[in-house]
Regions:
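NTP/phosphate- and nucleic-acid-binding module
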Residues: 1-168
Length: 168
């Protein structure tokens, strides 16, 4: 059975044979020590096409939903303006940047809601929110971009949490 579907070329292989090696006189020695013409090929992966294919396969009505392993940023911390200078926010950001490298602390001067929408749109796998809940209970909201699951976690919980293992 043949299934017909749409696809995108993300890589290619071209076999040139001896088309280029013969004019150059390029030869190799085989296992028996005999000289043979060199056979050539070209192999490539289109990185920009690969990114497009990943986005095509991993998006929803909110925007991109990057797989954790290839996400340009793994975690986005969103804090209300009055909490941006909070010691726990700084500690959390420092810890996460050392462990995961690709972490954003969104300190743009735009509304809280816009920051959350932007995080969803660009597909950051995890968003940590420090807002009203943090002020009331000292717990952050941890939101999974794929499932939209929202959990309350303390700073200590987040430092122990394995963001890569728990992303699905």
């Amino acid at each position: 059975n043949i299934t017909v579907g749409r696809g995108i070329e993300v890589g290619h292989i071209f076999y040139f044979g001896t088309k280029y090696s013969n004019p150059l006189g390029a030869k190799i020695s085989n296992k028996e020590g005999k000289t043979e013409d060199l056979h050539m090929g070209s192999y490539g992966i289109g990185v920009s096409r690969l990114v497009g294919a990943i986005i095509e396969a991993h998006h929803d009505e909110k925007g991109i939903a990057w797989p954790f392993q290839v996400a340009p940023f793994k975690i986005n911390i969103i804090a209300s303006d009055e909490l941006l200078k909070d010691d726990n926010i700084s500690k959390l950001y420092s810890f996460l940047i050392q462990k995961y490298k690709d972490v954003i602390l969104d300190d743009r001067g735009i509304t809280f809601g816009k920051k959350i929408k932007d995080s969803e749109l660009i597909g950051i796998p995890w968003t940590i929110i420090a807002g009203k809940n943090y002020i009331e209970s000292g717990k952050f909201e941890l939101v999974n971009r794929l499932t939209n699951n929202n959990e309350k976690k303390s700073l200590e919980d987040l430092e122990k949490f394995d963001f890569e293992k728990n992303f699905s």
